[in-house]
């Protein structure tokens, strides 16, 4: 495949992903041999497409390719933990987490990764709560504040749940997780007058202002030279990848050996 054809494929893929047409994007992804691509951003997008289609082994293989090409690997390790948890491969998730912690010892998102592993393992609620409480001491974000309140509810810690909901509503005022917190609180007691007013106007905020991902996790996945965002760091290769048949499937093994690396 020449460079023009590859660029056409890449533009089509970008367009489909932007429209969130991940089923259509999958057909494009499977028509290209990505082993010869150096761009971490592009490989990250390919992994996104596989992940959106619940093709976790393929997503993991692409992420391992990206990790092999990365000088830092922090953001890719974060995603490898997430994908391994979705595959219920907790041994590998823990291995990737340990690698992440080694290069991001002071990054608060390590608490989120560890929590996701515990949640996937269905660990006791007390352990999950303890970890999110540690995270909350360092970062107070809507999504995980609500998650903690919900865990309190599941654990039968009603007053802690109510207090956590009140705190979230007070600090963030509006948005998806504020509405969820108000719904959760109303299972146990009525909203305060000011909260009731917020609840009645809950659809007034603009949906496009709602973050699609927790800011701390997003920072790790997409940031630049700080170590979290290798996905946007490199240029496309001068030599373009080969197209493979759409029905040809993907390799069954993960990246291994020099023969699968870009020279």
Q: Can you name each region flagged by the protein language model?
A:
Residues 44-51, 64-68, 72-140:
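Alpha-helical adaptor scaffolds
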Residues 11-15, 49, 83, 117-119, ...:
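Residue-level signature for tetratricopeptide repeat
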Residues 11, 45, 79, 113, ...:
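"A position-specific structural signal for the A-helix of alpha-solenoid helical repeats
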Residues 7, 40-41, 74-75, 109, ...:
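Start-of-helix register in tetratricopeptide repeats
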Residues 19, 53, 87, 121-122, ...:
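Structural motif corresponding to the intra-repeat A-B loop/turn of tetratricopeptide repeats
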Residues 25, 59, 93, 127-128, ...:
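Single-residue signature of alpha-solenoid repeat helices
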Residues 196-263:
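Intrinsically disordered, low-complexity acidic segments enriched in Asp/Glu and Pro
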Residues 69, 102-104, 157-177, 182-208:
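TPR/TPR-like (Sel1-like) alpha-helical repeat modules
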């Amino acid at each position: 495949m020449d460079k023009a054809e590859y660029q056409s494929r890449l533009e089509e893929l970008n367009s489909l992903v932007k429209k969130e047409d991940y089923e259509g994007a999958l057909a494009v992804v499977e028509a290209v041999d990505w082993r010869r691509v150096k761009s971490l951003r592009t490989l990250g997008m390919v992994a996104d497409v596989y992940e959106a289609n619940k093709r976790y082994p393929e997503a993991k293989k692409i992420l391992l390719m990206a990790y092999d090409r990365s000088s830092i690997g922090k953001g890719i390790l974060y995603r490898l933990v997430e994908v391994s948890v979705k595959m219920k491969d907790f041994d590998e998730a823990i291995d990737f987490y340990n690698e992440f912690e080694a290069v991001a010892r002071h990054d608060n998102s390590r608490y989120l990764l560890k929590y996701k592993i515990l949640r996937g393992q269905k660990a006791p609620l007390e352990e999950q709560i303890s970890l999110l409480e540690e995270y909350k001491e360092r970062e107070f974000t809507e999504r995980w504040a609500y998650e903690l309140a919900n865990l309190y509810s599941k654990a039968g810690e009603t007053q802690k749940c109510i207090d956590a909901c009140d705190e979230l509503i007070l600090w963030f005022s509006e948005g998806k997780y504020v509405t969820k917190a108000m719904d959760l609180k109303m299972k146990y007691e009525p909203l305060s007058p000011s909260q009731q007013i917020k609840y009645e106007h809950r659809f007034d905020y603009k949906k496009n202002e709602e973050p699609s991902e927790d800011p701390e996790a997003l920072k790790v996945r997409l940031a630049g030279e700080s170590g979290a965002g290798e996905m946007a760091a490199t240029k496309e290769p001068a030599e373009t990848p080969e197209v493979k048949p759409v029905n040809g499937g993907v390799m069954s093994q993960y990246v291994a050996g020099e023969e699968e690396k870009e020279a």
